[in-house]
Amino acid sequence: VVVPRDYELLVPREWFRVDLMRDRWRSHLKTFVDRQSEGRHVSAELKRDVWTTLRNTAEAGRARGAMEFFLLTTSQDGGLPASLLVSLLPLGDTPADPEKYAAWLELREPEGPGRRRVSVVELTAGPAVRVLGATTLNVHVLMPGRAGYLTLSFSSPLIGMAGPMERLCDAIAGSLRWVV
């Protein structure tokens, strides 16, 4: 099995893309925050808080193999946008079998009403572990050649991960294709 050299992902045009592999990613992120607040009554404090949260998310993601960060404005008041962080997770101690990985993740989920639902799904790109929470959806897609997992981390802090947003995120994940 050939290890892919890249991937293709269909993300709607309304989502703002930040390439975390380039040095100028901070300026692109700043551009998004500025555009999101343009023509709206957004306080300087909220704008600064959104910038700080997104920057911290991008920096933490880069430290864990994130390559792309997509953002979608979901409110008129300039609050936190919906986002998609695309990361490469080398196998390391992570089980290469999606069923075993799902079981491993399930064991780490705390009991209670906030417990995320873990399942294994089959995408066009291959088997994937799907982890659904109230405001997040993580899809870990096993790469051909067992090179690792490509992780799609969706977050929708304002409107939640249900209904149309969940279906949109599933459709984006379902569009994943490998480039060999």
Segments predicted by a language model, with ranges:
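N-terminal targeting sequences that direct proteins away from the cytosol to non-cytosolic compartments
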Residues: V1-V180
